[in-house]
């Protein structure tokens, strides 16, 4: 299943033990034209901060962000970039000095929207 694939990828890419992940929901599937990937994002929970081991070929680094920081409007920014010789505004998150953009930013934007509407 897609959920099992998400758990497997989490284990393979950042080393989180499959047995400690509890899936609590899923987000909207999305297509990424640049990579031709279809992504089915899931939200997982662990009782404690999990041990991670980064797969260097897949992930640059792992860092933690509080839910409170994620939902702050000031952490969602835009910058100008060029795509196919056109200037475009690219949204990104600035989280504890880390820039999160692209597909990860799109997924986090939906998660942030859900969290803000739970209050």
Spans of model-derived segments:
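Unchanged
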Residues: 1-100, 109, 113-119
């Amino acid at each position: 299943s897609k959920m099992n694939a998400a758990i497997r990828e989490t284990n393979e890419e950042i080393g989180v033990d499959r047995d400690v992940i509890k899936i609590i929901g899923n987000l909207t599937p999305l297509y990424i034209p640049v990579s031709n990937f279809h992504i089915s994002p899931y939200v997982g929970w662990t009782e404690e901060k999990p041990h991670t081991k980064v797969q260097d070929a897949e992930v640059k680094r792992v860092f933690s962000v509080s839910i409170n920081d994620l939902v702050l409007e000031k952490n969602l920014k835009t910058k100008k970039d060029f795509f196919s010789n056109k200037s475009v505004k690219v949204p990104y998150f600035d989280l504890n000095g880390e820039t999160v953009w692209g597909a990860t930013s799109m997924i986090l934007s939906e998660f942030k929207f859900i969290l803000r509407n739970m209050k």
